[in-house]
Amino acid sequence: MSENRKLLEMNVPMWFDGKSINEALFCEDFLRTRQIIFANGAFFTPDGRVTDDLPLRGEIFEELKYCAVNNIPRKISNIIEIMKLAAHVEDFPPEQDRIHLANGTLMLDGTFTEGKPDIVRNRLPVFYRPDTPKPVLWLSFLNGLLYPEDIPTLQEFIGYCLIPSNKGQRMMVIKGNGGEGKSQIGAVLGQMLGSSMKDGSIGKISENRFARADLEHILLCVDDDMRMEALRQTNYVKSIVTAQGKMDLERKGKQSYQGWMFARLLAFSNGDLQALYDRSDGFYRRQLVLTTKEKPAGRMDDPDPVSYTHLRAHETDQYL
């Protein structure tokens, strides 16, 4: 009886010969039972972009741990690199007509499909419930923070941030004197968008040519406390706000490449976003500026009020 036949009868996987692992065969077998692709420098699954490969490494370890092989951590790293080749697809364009949610996909025409049958770029960690009541606490918070005519503008901008598209060609700046509670908007959006939102700095984006690459695959970048210094350069910021499709991205120590860019910019500030040298209409025309109401005299502040905690935990599903 051949060695391979003995292994089959022992229910040993074909990628293990009893002594060593055939990494290419392992990847082929692994990918046969899982939905995963590698595109644009990242792994994607039905749950969206893989932002932390530790769970993936854990799955691989569960397959390997019964095989007596040396240096399993290095073996797993090798398998991850081979998987990038085995699961590679040339491109994975964003889908601008739908929002992928925890319990299905909502099309922009209002139709909803349950489940996660397809691999997607972004999946938001909130549920779509068409019969959910109005988010009363959220609306009350907005009524106390913004003027009535500005609330629909904020709501539309938030809706705009749910799809991977920069067609609106606008960023938003919400300014106030401080202490109004405007940064709670960022906390709520973080609950809605999950790993599709990133904390960042408008100043860093304007100065650092590598900062744009950090926004690849991201739906929204929030600057929670925008610096008041006027921007020396505005071209990087404007290029993100007006991006249509792919743009040139660069990471430190690596050759530049073409990557999809659809990150929107939202900043909270005590003043206007100014440019030191750019006096063109284009820079200021791209900004939606909202001014908060004055902080009520005698209001007692709580850095993490129970009501806002409840809002972030229970009402984020109701925005949709």
Model feature map: region roles:
Residues 53-105:
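Long, basic/Gly/Ser/Thr-rich N-terminal segments
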Residues 210-216, 249-268:
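AAA+/SF3 P-loop NTPase mechanochemical coupling elements
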Residues 225-226, 263, 267-272, 293-294:
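A short beta-strand-to-loop transition that corresponds to the Sensor-1 phosphate-sensing loop
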Residues 309-316:
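Conserved small/polar residues in nucleotide/adenosyl-binding loops
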Residues 220-241, 277-282:
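Conserved AAA+/SF3 P-loop NTPase catalytic/coupling segment centered on the Walker-B
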Residues 200-205, 235-255, 303:
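Substrate-gripping "pore-loop 1 plus following alpha2 helix"
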Residues 31-58, 95, 99-100, 105-219, ...:
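P-loop NTPase catalytic core of nucleic-acid-dependent motor ATPases
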Residues 280-293:
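A short helix-turn-beta junction within AAA+ P-loop NTPase domains corresponding to the substrate/partner-engaging
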